[in-house]
Every structure is written in structure tokens, then in C-alpha cells.
Amino acid sequence: MSDQDKHEQLRIGLVSPEQILAWSERILPNGERVGQVTTERTLDYRTYEPVRDGLFCERIFGPKKRGVCACVKPRMMENDKENYNSNFCTQCGVELAIDPRIRRYRMGYIKLACPVVHIWYFKRRPSYIADLLDKTRKELEDPVYCDVCITRPTAKKPTLLRFQGLRPSKYESWAEKIAYYLSWDFGLVQEREIATGGKAIREQLAGLDLQMIIDRSYIEWKEIDEVISILFSEPENLFSNRKIYAQFKEQKLQKLRRRKDLLVRRMRFAKYFLRTNVEPQWMVLCLLPVLPPDLRPMFQLNEGGVITSDLNELYQTVIRRNNNVLQFIETTSAFLIPDLLPDQKKLVQQAVDALLDNSIGTQPVRDSHDRPYKSFSDFIQGKEGRFRENLLGKRVDYSGRSVIVVGPLLSLYQCGLPREIAIELFQAFLIRDLVERQIAPNLRAAKFLIRDRGPIIWNVLKQIMQKHPILLNRAPTLHRLGIQAFIPVLINERAIRLHPLVCAGFNADFDGDQMAVHVPLSMEAQVEARLLMFSHLNLISPTIGDPICVPTQDMLLGLYRSTLQKNQGIYENRYHPNSSKKKIVSPSFYSYDDALKAYEQKQIDLDSPLWLRWGREIDTSIINSVNRELPIEVQYECLGTFYEIYDHFRIRKGRVGEILNKYIRTTVGRIRFNREIEEAIKGLWTYDIRQEMLLFRI
């Protein structure tokens, strides 16, 4: 459907019977109203032409071919030239000048003999109908399927049912109570005093006051909240058996919480109906829309048989049972058998349920091969449904798809793009650059160069890709982080490389997941990708505000291993006179570079303890505990200088106690980790300074 601004959109919701009639009924040029499907037949199997008023009727849904009507007779009759109309056949009622593609969107309708409850709003969880009526789904199931009847309140007027002691709005068995009143006027009694099936549910929904439901539900919710607070405040010491009281208290709390949840749902549903101007009784169908025939096709085989969509079989069942109900209502003899008419209405309800959703019921309707029919819900839901397969899953130009693999060496805003995909996606940009740089004289020569895949092609392609972001998307795109922008990097593999930290936003892992690649073409799309969609700009979850790019378990284990230190500590230097091994002395280094060079030359290990000269101030307040940390050992030298050795650092002091130098206890792994942190902070500080300078210039 289209809104006032002519923007194409799709909205799923409830509509009134009048709106269904406006969509599916129309007036022919001769003044006849068409749109109602009255017969279950589809094609005449002798001529393979659509049957009049059937599921493929050309009067209702439009012609199969332009200019050819259903009667296939000459258009011009010599004796009827005055009444001749080239756009309409007066004999069969088919409009000839209409495009046959109209059979893809022109609808019909079935006028149901009895109202039918919509299964989506009754059997799905939560049940809209059950919650609004403040009943359980099990309580409503018998009235919906005509197993019990509901007595109607008729004010103070005497009724036959009231003489038997029945109270208004009470469920009673159809066969037991109605058998007393069988007569030729039974139809009048039924219409006045009892109701069952969708008609009874529709009357109850029509009598609801939505604003009153909201007010009363809120008052009851507050009362239950007060009761729960009282239960929590009661001391258990007042009761002799605490265990039994605790069980009773927990059961009572669970019951109250379930009631609170139901009240919240009732208020929310009532607000939805009020906000959208939708009536609750529209959840009960009086008119059943019939899909356009091209959306439920029927094909003729070469052998002479016909294959058809499952929807046609389900529609035929609905029409057949609906016609049976109409036939029973027209004959007065039907009222002599009390169970006959309700059973027929129950069959109509079950047929419509199978048409709308064949998977909710206890026993799905099956074909002759014991295969469940595909209902309307099956055609639109899931990965192969109409929305995800045909509407959202269309093929797009300048796009590709491949499996994702981990790329830990990439930056957060980079992704590895296979050469085969990159040269196809950026071929237009590549041809333009080759011609502009005069590497190729024309378009044809540029294509030959690209086909040869020479080194110059890859160099030009790298330069193009550095300036052009790409979009990565993983279906299903449930939130805005499902599609993000990256700077592509050429790789020789055939899979897309992705940084592991961005997988949380995509809800992806590396067990065979695939991602789609898109190239933004317009300048607006490229600006949006750079300013809003880059992965390093989307580090916070849009729903709850928590960080979404957090270190994974592999990273944490790697950091733990790289910063691990051997357990000996400074006691590694202690002298053992009885030991046959030589005394081990931890090496000392003047700078980061000296320690890293020693590690590269394999003189020390990654976790070997070492002393590193530290030119900065040591914050002893962090190291000292409440009792103030004392030196573990003090070593004196012959010239009067001495070392104060602590657990993680040592200080060399002069004769009068002045500090000469400081060394900290660390490892090569910790040095590398500290350097990475310093470079990251320095880069962030430089980025902030540049941003401030840019703002100052502006």
C-alpha cells in the first residue's frame, strides 16, 4: 500500500469487513458487482479454462490474456454493433483491455456463512482474544469450535433457558440443553437466546470498553502489587511450620505475578487498539479475502495433469464447507438434528484455521501423500517465505557473498576482501581510473587489462579500495548493527576476513556463516557509511547502551599468557649452598628496546623475570598496603650505597639515602603489552588534538 507521500510501504494488521469488501469487490461496466467467490471449482478440465465465480474466475481477477475473454467468441457482431464495447465482453463479463498482470494483485473474497475466529489472534501466544476477554485459551476453545454454547443476557425478559435455571453468559453443552426446545421455531430461539462459535466471540469482543479495561486493569495491578509487598514483609517466625509457609508463599506469589503479567498485557493490547483505531471484533472474520490467482498458481503438465498450489486446495475446502453451512441454514429440516449445524460450523472454523496457519492446530491437514499442506503463514514466514526470499532477499547490483573467516591482524574498521570479488565489484571504478591515467586508451582495452589480471591492475585496485568503503551485511538484519561499513583490504583467499570483535553486532561466528558485500555508489551513501556506519563508530549497543565490542575469551587467554610471570619472583636470586646448580641472577635492562632485543635473540623467555630501569616516579601508595610495605631485602655495597628490594621493584640509594636509580620487576610480555597501551593512548590523544585543531579552524 502507499501513504500520502507516495512512499511504498507494507503494514500487517487488522482491517474491517468494509475495507476487505472495498479491496475485493468492484462494479463492471454493465453495473454488475463481482468479487465474491462462490464455487470451489478452479478450471474446467476439458478446456482448462477458469470456471465462472471460481478461484480463477476472469470476471473477478482479470483476463489471462489481453483482448481474449472467457467465452472466446467473435467480438464484433453485425446485428449488435450499437452495443459493442471493445473493452468489455457483455456475454462473459470479462474486461478485455486490462493488463493480465492485474491477476497478481486483484483480490476476491468469500462471504462466510458464520463468523470465524482468526487463528493468529486466538491460538498464538500471547492470545489477544483470550487476554482481552480475561479468559484462558482453553476456556474459549470449546465456544470457538461450537462444542458449547453461550447464553445471551436478555435483561429482565423471560427466556426459555432461564426457566431451566441457566444463568446468563454461562457455558452449557449444546446437545444437552438445546434438545428440550426443538421445534420449527428453533431458529428464532437460537438467534435470541444462545450463541456459539465465532459469532459468540464476536459479540463479546464488540461489547468491550477498552478504556474501562485499561482503568480497571491498572487498579487491580496496584492492588496485587500491594498484596505482594505485604507477603514479602510478613515475618516467617510467626508460623510454626516455616517450610509449608514458604511453599504456600511461593505458590501465592507465582499466581499473583502471572495475574500481573496478564493485566499488563491487557492494558497494552487495549492501548494498541485505541491508538490504531482498530475494533477488537475485527479479529473475528466475516469475509475471508482470496489471494490473487498468480500468487497461488496452477500449471498444466505435458502429460495432461495439473499441479496446483496448496492454498488452492485449502481454499476449496473452505468454500465447500461454507456452502454446506449455507445449504443447512436454508433448509428448516436441519434444526431437527441439534448437533448437525454446529458440527458444520466447526468444520468451517477448522478449514479457515488450516488455510491461515496449518501448523498451530493439533493435527495439520494433509494431502493424499500424508504431507502437510503449506498454509498462508508458511508461505510468508521463515527464510524461504515471501518476505525474506522475494522481497528482502532480492539480488542487488554491485554486491557479492562469501563465507567469513577470522582476521585477527586486521584493524577494527578493516575487512579482508577476496580478489575475485573485489575486481568484479570495483570493475567500473577500475575501468574509469585506467582510462583517466592513460594506462588504457579506451573501454575495450581496459577490459582486456582487467581480464589479464596484471600487477598494475592490483595496484590501481588497492588505491581505489583505500578511498571507497564497503558495506557488510549478515541476514537476518534485526537491528542497525547488522550492516556496517569497512575499508576493504585485498587478500588472496576466497573467504571474507573479519575482525573477531565486530562479530557480536552481526551475531555471527566462524562456523560457516556467510555475509553479503555491498558497494555504496552515491556520494550520500558513502558519506553516511563513513560518518555513521563504520564499525569503530558502533561500539555501543543501541538497545541497552552496553559495550558490544568486548574482548573475547581467546584475547583474554592470550593477554593472560603474555603477561604471565614465573613463580620464583625475587627468591630466584637467593643463594642455596647445597644446590649443585649455579646461582641464577635476573638480568637488568636499561630500556624497553634492550629487553625486546634480548628476547628476539632468545637470551630470555617471554615470562622470564627481569629488572627494567625506570626513569619515572613510582607511585608507592598503590603498592603499599595499610601497614605500609617494608623492603623484603636490603643489600649493602662496599662504597656505602645500598639496594632496597621490594616485591615488584628495587631502589638504589646513596650514603645519605638519596635515590640514585629505580628498577621494576617485570617480563618481556608485560613490556610489550604496556607499549601497546601507551601507543594506543598516544594515538587517541593525537586524534583528539587534531579534532580540536579542526574545530578551531572551523
Curated annotation (Swiss-Prot):
Q: What does this protein do?
A: DNA-dependent RNA polymerase catalyzes the transcription of DNA into RNA using the four ribonucleoside triphosphates as substrates.
Q: Which named protein is this? A: DNA-directed RNA polymerase subunit beta'
Instruction: Give, as one word, the top-level EC class.
Output: transferase
The UniProt gene name for this protein comes to rpoC1
- GO terms, molecular function: DNA binding; DNA-directed RNA polymerase activity; magnesium ion binding; zinc ion binding
Ordered alphabetically, the record's keywords are: Chloroplast, DNA-directed RNA polymerase, Magnesium, Metal-binding, Nucleotidyltransferase, Plastid, Transcription, Transferase, Zinc
Q: Which Gene3D superfamilies match?
A: 1.10.40.90, 2.40.40.20, RNA polymerase II, clamp domain (4.10.860.120), RNA polymerase Rpb1, domain 3 (1.10.274.100)
Please give the family membership noted in the entry. Answer: Belongs to the RNA polymerase beta' chain family. RpoC1 subfamily.
Residues that bind Zn(2+): 69, 71, 89, 92
Its lineage opens with: Eukaryota, Viridiplantae, Streptophyta, Embryophyta, Tracheophyta
